[in-house]
């Protein structure tokens, strides 16, 4: 199955244009439907593809307003490439949305979800591969009462887009993703006081601040994340999978529930996590 058969064609792809500002991309990324947005620019031969703006770029660089400075150059594929080629590229690059570019022009977007959907429908190789060996046994977790800004920091440090939420007994009770966080994040303008302004000494979640060096105010522009507990934003209905289930079974669960990861369970114990990018290994090895 080729990329052209699975991709979203250019006429249906949401893009932003240079010149522009971060708000142009934020209105699409904040809705949670996309993890990145293609950036185009008018050229001598028509519209030219310039790169992607990602959620991560907006969060990591909150003071950058110029769209051109937020653009990342990313690997691309042609419309004639196979979905196995896409699976391999995603595994190597870590980009979930791959621009389809023919002769410097954006022809469409192909995503991890497109490959997973083809796997769920039995349209590509890898359907009968068992998911146990594909899963990751290290699971990123957070406590249910962890403030959401701290959860965001933990996702950044762990370099994963999810966290399983644990209850007071240490049992998984939900899943929280970067999509859940970006949906409630807001860009705030204002003034920040530096120097003597440190966290409350009685704050249970105090993070060590910079040593006080005097008071001054600086104009700031930050991504504000509600300081509320993780459990208020998590998905409570955990959809799980066992080691012996096939890649096609897991793909069908992901597509039907619109999720990107499945806790791997043995009896009542969570022993790993199966992410959509893990399933791509089935497509590659069974090609």
Label the model's feature ranges.
Residues 1-287:
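Tandem CBS (Cystathionine beta-synthase) repeat/Bateman regulatory domains
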